[in-house]
Amino acid sequence: MSLMTMNILLAFFISLMGMMMYRSHIMSSLLCLESMMLSLFMLATVLTLDMSFITMTIIPMTLLVFAACEAAIGLSLLVMVSNTYGLDYVQNLNLLQC
């Protein structure tokens, strides 16, 4: 395993730990999710280039599409919760179930 791959995996696990530690606020959770998706994108790109799989080049682009969708949905939930309750706590998401 190369040094670059280990650094990317370390970044993923650090952001996973951040997700576990700062899970009370939506904004902190979204930032940790975005860093996890970024490290997964970098890992998929590095592994695709290292293994010289031409057919696997669609996987990093698919990850970017999912990351953009996740960011849009997360930010819309953040705006809705903060406009409704004035706070960005994750526990307020349970109150949105009509």
From Swiss-Prot:
Question: What GO terms in the biological process aspect are recorded for it?
Answer: ATP synthesis coupled electron transport
Provide the transmembrane region boundaries: 1-21, 36-56, 58-78
- Give the first-level EC class, as a single word: translocase
Which GO molecular function annotations are given, in alphabetical order?
Answer: NADH dehydrogenase (ubiquinone) activity
State if Transcription is listed as a keyword: no
Note the subunit structure: Core subunit of respiratory chain NADH dehydrogenase (Complex I) which is composed of 45 different subunits.
The record's subcellular locations are:
Mitochondrion inner membrane
The name on file for this protein is NADH-ubiquinone oxidoreductase chain 4L
Q: What is its EC number?
A: 7.1.1.2
- Gene transcribed to yield this protein: MT-ND4L
Gene Ontology cellular-component terms for this entry are: mitochondrial inner membrane; respiratory chain complex I
Question: Which species expresses this protein natively?
Answer: Macroscelides proboscideus (Short-eared elephant shrew)
InterPro entries for this protein: NADH_UbQ_OxRdtase_chain4L/K, NUOK/Mnh_C1-like
Which reaction does this enzyme catalyse, per its entry?
a ubiquinone + NADH + 5 H(+)(in) = a ubiquinol + NAD(+) + 4 H(+)(out)
According to its UniProt entry, what is the function of this protein?
A: Core subunit of the mitochondrial membrane respiratory chain NADH dehydrogenase (Complex I) which catalyzes electron transfer from NADH through the respiratory chain, using ubiquinone as an electron acceptor. Part of the enzyme membrane arm which is embedded in the lipid bilayer and involved in proton translocation.
